[in-house]
């Protein structure tokens, strides 16, 4: 009876590890909305033209999510106060070539992002040096998180975040079976 109860606890632990609750990086859009702001009058709600979402390489994706990235003490305070102004993703598909390495992908992603968002980089702000430093660090982190699916097929990259909970579960089950 005690052995079965232990097996159930290991199974529950494995389910929690496999759910990847700890790897979620977004924290929500808590400070994005200004609740006391008056609503501007609209133009009758009629749509006059269709707008197509721009998916050019390097385009920022801004959804108001707060990413879990360390910018240093001063940068963390600035990012926490202004995260809704920063991108939380970059549209970039750089896996068209068969022999793309991780370094090539990150470099081309950063270059495409810089070319596509010149207005954002040239924007003058009172705290522009800190803003630019946080923005560049954010771009480098987002680009370095990108990967090509064919890397996994070739076995060139090991997805530790996915494989680690599976290995812990496997070791736990083997330990209980042997015991």
From Swiss-Prot:
Keywords: Amyloid, Cell membrane, Copper, Disulfide bond, Fertilization, Glycoprotein, GPI-anchor, Lipoprotein, Membrane, Metal-binding, Prion, Signal. GO terms for biological process: acrosome reaction; intracellular copper ion homeostasis; protein homooligomerization; single fertilization. GO terms for cellular component: external side of plasma membrane. Residues 156-179 form a propeptide. N-glycosylated. N-glycosylated at two distinct sites. O-glycosylated. Detected in testis. Detected within seminiferous tubules, on round and elongated spermatids (at protein level). Not detected in brain (at protein level). Detected in testis, and at low levels in heart. Expression in brain is very low and barely detectable. It is a lipid-anchor; GPI-anchor. It comes from the Eukaryota. The keyword tRNA processing does not apply. Residues 125-142 are annotated as: Cu(2+) binding. Residues 51-155 are annotated as: Globular. A lipid is attached at residue 155 (GPI-anchor amidated glycine). Its main location: membrane. Disruption phenotype: Mice are born at the expected Mendelian rate and appear grossly normal and healthy. Females are fertile, but males are almost completely sterile, in spite of normal mating behavior. Two independent studies conclude that male sterility is due to impaired acrosome reaction, but describe contradictory effects on spermatogenesis, possibly due to the use of different mouse strains. Spermatogenesis is normal, with normal sperm counts, normal sperm motility, and no malformation of the sperm head or tail. GO terms for molecular function: copper ion binding. Required for normal acrosome reaction and for normal male fertility. Can bind Cu(2+). Loss of cerebellar Purkinje cells and ataxia has been observed in mice with mutations that cause Prnd overexpression in the brain, suggesting that aberrant overexpression of Prnd causes neurotoxicity. This is Prion-like protein doppel. The gene is Prnd.
């Amino acid at each position: 009876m005690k052995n079965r109860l232990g097996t159930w606890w290991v199974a529950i632990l494995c389910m929690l590890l496999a759910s990847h609750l700890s790897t979620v990086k977004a924290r929500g859009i808590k400070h994005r909305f200004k609740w006391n702001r008056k609503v501007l009058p609209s133009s009758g709600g009629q749509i006059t033209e269709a707008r197509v979402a721009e998916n050019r390489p390097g385009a920022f994706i801004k959804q108001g999510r707060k990413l879990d990235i360390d910018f240093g003490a001063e940068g963390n305070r600035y990012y926490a106060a202004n995260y809704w102004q920063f991108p939380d993703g970059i549209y970039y598909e750089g896996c068209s070539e068969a022999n793309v390495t991780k370094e090539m992908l990150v470099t081309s992603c950063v270059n495409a992002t810089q070319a596509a968002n010149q207005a954002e980089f040239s924007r003058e702000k009172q705290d522009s040096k800190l803003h630019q430093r946080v923005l560049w660090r954010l771009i480098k982190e987002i680009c370095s998180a990108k990967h090509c699916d064919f890397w996994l097929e070739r076995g060139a990259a090991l997805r530790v975040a996915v494989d680690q909970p599976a290995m812990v579960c496997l070791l736990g089950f083997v330990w209980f079976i042997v015991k």
